[in-house]
Design a protein with these regions (language model features):
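Kinked, hydrophobic transmembrane alpha-helices enriched for aromatic residues
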Residues: 14-50, 64, 68-79, 98-119, ...
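Specific transmembrane alpha-helix
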Residues: 69-81, 160-171, 193-234, 275-296, ...
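Interfacial loop-to-helix transition and helix-capping segments at the boundaries
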Residues: 17, 56-69, 146-161, 197-219, ...
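C-terminal "closing" transmembrane helix and its immediate cytosolic amphipathic cap
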Residues: 1-10, 291-306, 317-374
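Alpha-helical transmembrane segments and terminal signal-anchor/GPI-anchor hydrophobic tails
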Residues: 4-5, 229-303, 326
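Perimembrane loop-to-helix junctions flanking transmembrane segments
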Residues: 45-58, 131-135, 139
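Hydrophobic alpha-helical segments with transmembrane-like composition
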Residues: 65-68, 72, 81-85, 100, ...
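Membrane-interface helix-boundary motifs at transmembrane edges
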Residues: 12-16, 85-94, 171-181, 226-239, ...
């Protein structure tokens, strides 16, 4: 018996436009987590002096950098139900395997060959959690498929977790239709997010998540679609308030992260982390609502960059790594609060964006030429 997933809901055009505009900005925010110059963990793991330098470092990597994954996961869950209605489960999985699993494989293997292998050959302390050099089949498998390890190309754990969400899509979509149970599941998932539980049901790959907040946000997206809600907030004052709430919560949490030592206040840090991620979703939804309802140069630029966002996600760690090596070789280590630090961050980001544009454009042109020749 075939389950009828059709709900008769079509997201408003504004929602699609807002998603398109916010996507590249979320990817850029995610890339903040891979700024090697920002050592926020040393500040969080031991009570540090509260000065602007320490606060800003933690604010960028402990706050803003975490805002990309939750909303991208929510958007994926929201659109997943529409795709399930259109294609059915098996065809959707094939499509998502091409979109998520195939890039997970090639981008990690390329990263291993170009970066991790030679780096470990020179220094075994580089990614000691992965046995790449000397060759280990298990180590390469873990580094490629995010098998109970952060993969070689670190941000690509998101692809593995997102594909797991699609594996669970029929279950999540069915539960979302059951009144009261759907809300109870939200509470259960939130609890697992706060206390960093990794398994959906069992500690078995691939149902083991690197970040459980990914499936939590994915499920919230499914619920919003089931409740026939758009993702654009119409009230400008509400949007401004939510953006302010996100910045305030991230800034306040950064103060606590700097002043207190995480090992001694682990539970407080876990709850603060969840609150920051929750506020980040609200703030980023509000921000994309403002961008799409009040179009200008920034929203126009983001809209133009949107087709290159996925390529930026896949390749930015390559560019960051090579750029950092070139910079330190030429100029030495950049100083975070000096001119060198500002130039380093800005130029590295611009280089990553330009590389994504060039690579995506070249690939599109090559595919078009091959198809024309066929």
């Amino acid at each position: 018996m075939k389950f009828d997933w059709t709900q008769g809901f079509v997201p408003p055009p504004e929602t699609s436009a807002a998603i398109r505009v916010i996507r590249p900005l979320l990817i850029i925010l995610m890339s903040f987590a891979h700024f090697g110059i920002l050592d926020h963990l040393s500040r969080m793991n031991s009570a540090a002096t509260l000065d602007f330098s320490n606060w800003l470092m933690v604010f960028l990597k402990g706050g803003l950098a975490k805002s990309g994954v939750p909303l991208l996961s929510l958007i994926s869950g929201y659109l997943a139900v529409l795709s399930l209605e259109r294609y059915g489960y098996l065809e959707l999985l094939v499509r998502k395997a091409r979109r998520l699993v195939w890039p997970l494989i090639w981008a990690n293997l390329l990263f291993i060959v170009l970066i991790t292998w030679p780096a470990q050959a020179q220094n075994p302390e580089v990614r000691p959690d992965l046995q790449i050099h000397p060759f280990s089949a298990l180590g390469w498998f873990q580094a490629t498929f995010a098998f109970y390890r952060i993969p070689a190309n670190e941000p690509l754990y998101f692809l593995k977790d997102l594909f797991t969400c699609f594996l669970l899509l029929p279950l999540l979509a069915a539960v979302a239709r059951v009144k009261y149970l759907n809300v109870a599941v939200i509470i259960w998932m939130a609890w697992k997010c706060i206390y960093l539980e990794s398994a959906f049901f069992f500690e078995i790959y691939p149902l083991w998540f690197m970040r459980f907040d990914i499936v939590f946000a994915f499920y919230v997206g499914i619920l919003l679609y089931h409740w026939k809600r758009g993702l654009v907030i119409n009230s400008t004052p509400v949007n401004a308030g939510l953006v302010s709430l996100f910045l305030f919560s991230s800034g306040t949490a950064a103060v606590v992260y700097v002043l207190l030592a995480q090992p001694e206040h682990r539970e407080l840090f876990l709850w603060l982390d969840f609150v920051v991620k929750l506020c980040s979703v609200l703030g980023c939804v509000a921000l994309m609502s403002l961008l799409v309802r009040h179009p200008g140069r920034i929203s126009g630029l983001l809209d133009w960059l949107s087709p290159f966002a996925y390529t930026l996600f896949l390749t930015h760690l390559f560019i960051f790594t090579f750029f950092t090596r070139a910079w330190t070789g030429l100029f030495g280590a950049p100083e975070f609060f000096g001119v060198s630090g500002v130039l380093y961050i800005v130029m590295m980001l611009v280089s990553a964006v330009l590389a994504a544009i060039v690579l995506k454009s070249a690939w599109t042109a090559m595919v078009a030429r091959v198809r024309a020749g066929a």
